[in-house]
Amino acid sequence: REIALSVTVSGYTSRPCETDSTPFVTAANTTTRRGVIALSRDLVRRYTPGAPFNFGDVVHLNGIGDFVVEDVMAGRWERHADIWFESLDEARLFGRRRAVLTGPYGPGDAYQASQRGVAQVASGRGGAAP
C-alpha cells in the first residue's frame, strides 16, 4: 500500500559530528553512498511498530528523486527525511525543504535497487537534481 506524507527534507554527510561512531555505516549496516536516505524513527518499523517504511524500501520525494531507506535520524526528529551527500557543501546547497514522501516501492531490497540506479541523486552525476 502506497503512503504519501508531507515531510521536512534536509541533507547530511558522514562527518562524525552528524553521525555516530561509525559515520560511513548506516543503521541498516550498509555503506553510505548516493541515494541513501535516513528517515526519522517515527517512519521506520524497526523503531516504531506500525510505521510505514522498512530498511530497503525505495521511497520517492516529489521534485527531488528516489532513495533507498537505509539509515535513521536521531530520536528528536519526526516526519523528517535526511538525504546523504558526499560533502558538506552539497548538503548545504540542498538546504532544508518540504516535500511529499511516497512509497514504499520494492521493499526489502536496497542492494538491488541501488544497483539498478533507482537511488541516484544530485550534482550532475545522474538521477534527479535536488
Residue ranges, per PLM feature:
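Solvent-exposed, well-ordered loop and adjacent helix/strand elements within mature globular domains
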Residues: 1-130
